[in-house]
Amino acid sequence: MIIYLDLDGVIINWVKGIFNWFEIPYDPSKVTHWDSIQELTNNTKQEFWTKIKFSAFWENLDFYPDSRLFIDRIKKYGEVILLSSPAYGCAGYRQNWIEKNLPEFFNNGHYILTPSKWTCAHKNTILIDDSDENYQKFIQNGGNAIIYPQPWNITREIFKQEMSEQEKNNLVIDTLYLMKNQIRSN
């Protein structure tokens, strides 16, 4: 079984990186939908992406506090491959981040950088991602997927109260356990 693990919004606190980059006081509760960030930074979509197209931004993003433990827990269920959709023109920066922060994945080539995550989907794969679109396309193309709970995706309708990172990780691990057993029995 291959478990594809998204980075931004799952193990990397991309939102905090944005708040820091634009010198906005960090308040993740203000990010309530996918385009919140552009609105909070008072930029058009194009302006926003242009302003973060720098190595200093992408290469210095921080993990969520429990991310390394989360990765170790996921490894118990299959081969973990990082699957990231870097911003246009920033793939090299993402690769540098992986080399610096997750050298075991970098050195073993256990990462894929593509905006078309759905191309990795097949019946023995599970994607863990915070994007509704990536989640849906992965399933539509024959893979299995778990949506990582974040206020900007469909889980906001299910979980009305804010969840801690540990609660999110535990929910994903529990779902991964059930999903792996279901895949095994099919």
Question: How should each PLM-predicted stretch be described?
Answer:
Residues I126-M163, E167-D174:
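Acidic, Mg2+-coordinating phosphoryl-transfer loop and its flanking beta/alpha structural elements
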Residues E99-L113, I158-N186:
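Structural recognition of alpha->loop->beta junctions
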Residues W49-A56:
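Short glycine/proline- and acidic residue-enriched helix-loop micro-motifs
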Residues L83-I128, D132-K137:
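Substrate-recognition "cap/lid" segment bordering the active-site pocket of phosphatases
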Residues M1-W49:
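Active-site neighborhood of HAD-like aspartate-dependent phosphohydrolases
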